[in-house]
Design a protein with these regions (language model features):
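Short aromatic-enriched loop/helix-cap "lid" or pocket-rim segments at secondary-structure transitions
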Residues: 16-20, 90-91
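Generic structural signal of hydrophobic/aromatic residues within well-ordered alpha-helices
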Residues: 20-27, 140, 209
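Serine-hydrolase catalytic core
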Residues: 45-190, 194-214
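Active-site nucleophile loop of the alpha/beta-hydrolase fold
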Residues: 5-17, 25, 31-32
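Short, proline-centered helix/strand-breaking motifs
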Residues: 9-11, 22, 50, 75
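A structural motif
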Residues: 24-39, 45-50
Length: 216
């Protein structure tokens, strides 16, 4: 292995409840059962969550945290979104800045401000794109082209229902011109937001990844 590509890595998350997962798994098989999930599930969107999957994720997180406590000297490219609703990206960037010691290591950061780092090179790209009605990026969006048939522009029918909202038709019937996109689905600032599932900077990101792989 000559290096790492990390897209929205999640050894750190924005909740303190993760530590309770191993204990809770002794009493519950599902965090959200298929019956509770209701509508909104598609081939490209999960709404059920078994506890065994969460336990496996927590175990992976623990190993990743241990690894980040040690210096890593091969090049690493990390992709993070400032407003990720799940991943604690500020903490992840801080850990990367301290542990990824290769001078070729870098982070592509989607956000409103360029974070300060000691060593890590940061390529900052804006996540607030007014003309495209985009306020912030989700961890899912960084991986997909706007042309992707399932996650790209025009694929809102797969994702138009914000989590836990009982009115899926309401969101699906809103004209495209009135929809905004962000790290999660919600209503605020007078706008209806649905989760952004594609990356408007996908071509630029691809260029950066290819340059990294070529040793530049």
């Amino acid at each position: 292995m000559e290096g790492l590509l990390l897209f929205s890595p999640a050894p750190y998350v924005r909740t303190n409840l993760v530590g309770l997962v191993p204990f809770a798994s002794l009493f519950f098989e599902w965090l959200r059962t298929p019956e509770e999930a209701g509508g909104g599930t598609t081939a490209f969107r999960y709404r059920t969550l078994p506890m065994t999957g969460l336990v496996a994720y927590c175990d992976t997180m623990d190993h990743a945290e241990e690894a980040l406590e040690k210096p890593y000297r091969k090049p690493v490219l990390t992709v993070l979104s400032e407003f990720d609703s799940i991943v604690d990206t500020e903490r992840m960037l801080e850990a990367a800045d301290e542990s990824f010691l290769n001078p070729r290591s870098r982070t592509i950061w989607y956000g409103d401000e360029t974070p300060e780092t000691k060593v890590m090179k940061v390529i900052s790209l804006p996540s607030h794109l007014e003309k495209e009605h985009i306020r912030s990026f989700s961890h899912l969006s960084v991986n997909f082209s706007p042309e992707n048939p399932h996650y790209g522009r025009g694929a809102r029918a797969e994702w138009c229902r914000p989590e836990n909202d009982p009115r899926p038709r309401f969101y699906c019937e809103i004209p495209e011109s009135e929809i905004w996109y962000g790290a999660w689905g919600e209503e605020r600032d007078g706008h209806v937001y649905v989760r952004l599932t594609y990356n408007p900077h996908f071509e630029r990101q691809t260029e950066e990844v290819l340059a990294f792989l070529r040793g530049k």
